[in-house]
Amino acid sequence: MISKTRKAEIIKEFGGSEANTGLAEVQIALLTEDIANMTEHLKEHKKDVPTRRTLLKKVAQRRHLLDFLIKKDVNRYKEIIAKLGLRK
């Protein structure tokens, strides 16, 4: 789970202001942070099935947002992929 301060930093970095939480880039960045945290958790707790299920849901949700973004604006898609270091 992301702390409030880290969440605010991500929102400000990708959304421009702390109030701009609905932007696709912000949502993708927050999901990426959650996914990274869950991945680290699962490396230690291999049999934690509920967390694994939640991880897969979050990956799918991020994929849908990335698909939406590539349809709307390819340049924004390329920027977010480069910033977060995601594969295509």
Swiss-Prot record:
Stored InterPro entries: Ribosomal_uS15 (IPR000589), Ribosomal_uS15_bac-type (IPR005290), uS15_NS1_RNA-bd_sf (IPR009068)
Residue ranges that the Swiss-Prot or TrEMBL entry lists as coiled coil: none
GO molecular function: rRNA binding; structural constituent of ribosome
Descriptive protein name: Small ribosomal subunit protein uS15
Transcription listed as a keyword: no
Subunit structure: Part of the 30S ribosomal subunit. Forms a bridge to the 50S subunit in the 70S ribosome, contacting the 23S rRNA.
Keyword field: Ribonucleoprotein, Ribosomal protein, RNA-binding, rRNA-binding
Organism: Mesoplasma florum (strain ATCC 33453 / NBRC 100688 / NCTC 11704 / L1)
Function text: One of the primary rRNA binding proteins, it binds directly to 16S rRNA where it helps nucleate assembly of the platform of the 30S subunit by binding and bridging several RNA helices of the 16S rRNA.
PANTHER family: RIBOSOMAL PROTEIN S15, BACTERIAL AND ORGANELLAR, SMALL RIBOSOMAL SUBUNIT PROTEIN US15M
UniProt-listed NCBIfam families: S15_bact
Top-rank taxon, per record: Bacteria
HAMAP family according to UniProt: Ribosomal_uS15_B
Family: Belongs to the universal ribosomal protein uS15 family.
Biological process annotations from GO: translation
One of the record's GO cellular component terms: cytosolic small ribosomal subunit
SUPFAM superfamilies in the cross-refs: S15/NS1 RNA-binding domain
TM spans (from-to): none
